[in-house]
C-alpha cells in the first residue's frame, strides 16, 4: 500500500473519501470478501484456479491477489445496489473455489493461521507441544500469540545441538549420524519426543538450515523438515 504525503492525505480525506462515501451511499454498495490460502505460491495458485477466475467476470466480480510469505489472500469485490444479492453472489463463488482447493483454504476475512489452529485444537479438546531447531521458538511464539492458547499449548523444547536432541528429545544418535539433523527421520523423532516429554496429543517439530551458512548440495540453505505427530494418526511430514 502506497504511503501518502501530507498534501495528498488532505486531498484524500477532504475530497476523495467523502465523494466515494456519498456515491456508495446514494448509488451502490461495495462489498469485499477475502479468502485466505496457504501452501501454494501465487503463480501456481492462479494457474490452478484460472477457470474459476474466468467465470467471475460473468457476475462482474473483481479479484485481487494479495501475497505475503507463505500466504496468498484472494480478495473478491463486487458493487451493486442489493447488498444481500451481492453477498450471496460472492459466497456462491467462494464455495466453488473451496471445492477446487479445499486443502489450501484455511480461513476467511481476518482469520489467522494461529487462530484457526487454536480453534481446531479447542474444538477437539486437544493439546500440542513443539520441538524447534531452525525456527528457534518462532512456532511457539505464533501459537501463544492467541489469547487463551494456554488451554491447548503445553510448551516447547528448543534444541539446536545434537546433544540436546539426544538428551531432551531422545532422538537416536544413529539417526543423527546416518541421516543428519535436517532429515525426515530426525524431525519425526523430535516430534515424537516432545509429545511424550510434555504429554500432549500433538507433537510438532521443525529442523532445517536457516543460513546464510551451513548449506550443502544435498541440503541447501532454506531446506526445512516439519513433522506432526498425533496419538491416533500416522506421521505427517513435509519438506
How would you name each of these model-derived features?
Residues 7, 71, 208-212:
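Short glycine-rich anion-binding loops that position phosphate/pyrophosphate groups of nucleotides
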Residues 64, 196, 201-228, 232:
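Extended hydrophobic
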Amino acid at each position: 500500500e502506497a504511503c501518502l504525503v501530507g498534501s495528498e492525505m488532505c486531498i484524500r480525506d477532504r475530497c476523495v473519501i467523502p465523494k466515494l462515501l456519498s456515491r456508495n451511499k446514494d448509488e451502490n454498495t461495495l462489498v469485499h470478501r477475502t479468502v485466505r490460502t496457504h501452501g501454494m505460491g501465487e503463480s501456481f495458485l492462479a494457474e490452478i484456479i484460472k477457470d474459476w477466475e474466468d467465470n467471475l467476470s460473468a457476475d462482474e466480480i473483481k479479484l485481487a491477489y494479495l501475497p505475503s510469505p507463505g500466504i496468498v489472500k484472494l480478495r473478491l469485490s463486487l458493487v451493486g445496489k442489493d447488498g444481500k444479492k451481492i453477498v450471496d453472489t460472492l459466497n456462491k463463488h467462494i464455495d466453488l473455489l473451496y471445492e477446487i482447493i479445499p486443502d489450501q483454504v484455511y480461513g476467511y476475512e481476518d482469520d489467522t493461521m494461529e487462530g484457526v489452529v487454536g480453534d481446531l485444537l479447542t474444538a477437539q479438546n486437544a493439546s500440542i507441544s513443539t520441538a524447534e531447531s531452525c525456527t528457534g521458538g518462532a512456532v511457539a511464539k505464533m501459537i501463544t500469540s492467541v489469547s487463551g492458547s494456554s488451554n491447548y499449548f503445553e510448551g516447547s523444547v528448543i534444541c539446536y545441538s545434537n546433544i540436546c536432541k539426544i538428551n531432551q528429545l531422545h532422538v537416536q544418535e544413529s539417526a543423527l549420524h546416518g541421516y543428519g539433523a535436517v532429515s525426515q527421520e530426525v524431525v519425526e523423532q523430535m516430534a515424537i519426543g516432545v509429545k511424550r516429554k510434555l504429554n500432549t496429543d500433538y507433537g510438532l517439530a521443525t529442523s532445517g538450515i536457516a543460513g546464510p551458512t551451513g548449506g550443502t548440495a544435498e541440503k541447501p540453505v532454506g531446506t526445512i523438515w516439519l513433522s506432526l505427530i498425533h496419538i491416533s494418526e500416522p506421521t505427517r511430514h513435509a519438506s
